[in-house]
Amino acid sequence: MNSHFVSAHTPFYINTKEGRYLVLKAVKVCDVRTVECEGSKASCVLKVDKPSSPTCERRPSSPSRCERMNNPGKQVPFMRTDMLQNMFAANRDNVTSRLLN
């Protein structure tokens, strides 16, 4: 089986039951077979335990999107670092080279 790995467009958010996650780097995997499995019929089921970190459990929930939009004066500052700046520059260069080719 031949697999192809392609860099996905980043950054982006993923909304889950546990909260909202910012994805800074992602890899898109192509031509990989998906196996359907039902837990009740499977002979082996992967169990994932949630971390028991007290800082995660005590963290206050973030305000809803409506609350954020009602307070336009309170914008969250963007932390500028060389790592993020280089990542965005590389992404911009990749998009530019794709458009020109």
From Swiss-Prot:
Keywords: DNA-binding, Host-virus interaction, Inhibition of host innate immune response by virus, Late protein, Phosphoprotein, Viral immunoevasion, Virion
Cited function: Plays an essential role in virion assembly and morphogenesis. Also plays a role in the inhibition of host immune response by dysregulating mTOR. Sequesters host RICTOR and RPTOR, thereby disrupting mTORC1 and mTORC2 crosstalk. In turn, blocks the host antiviral response in part through mTOR-dependent degradation of cGAS, the primary poxvirus sensor.
Signal peptide boundaries: none
Gene Ontology biological-process entries: symbiont-mediated suppression of host innate immune response; viral protein processing
A GO CC annotation given for this chain: virion component
InterPro entries: Phosphoprotein_F17 (IPR006854)
Pfam families for this protein: Pox_F17
Protein name per the record: Phosphoprotein OPG062
Location in the cell: Virion
Family per record: Belongs to the orthopoxvirus OPG062 family.
Ranges where the record places region Disordered: 50-73
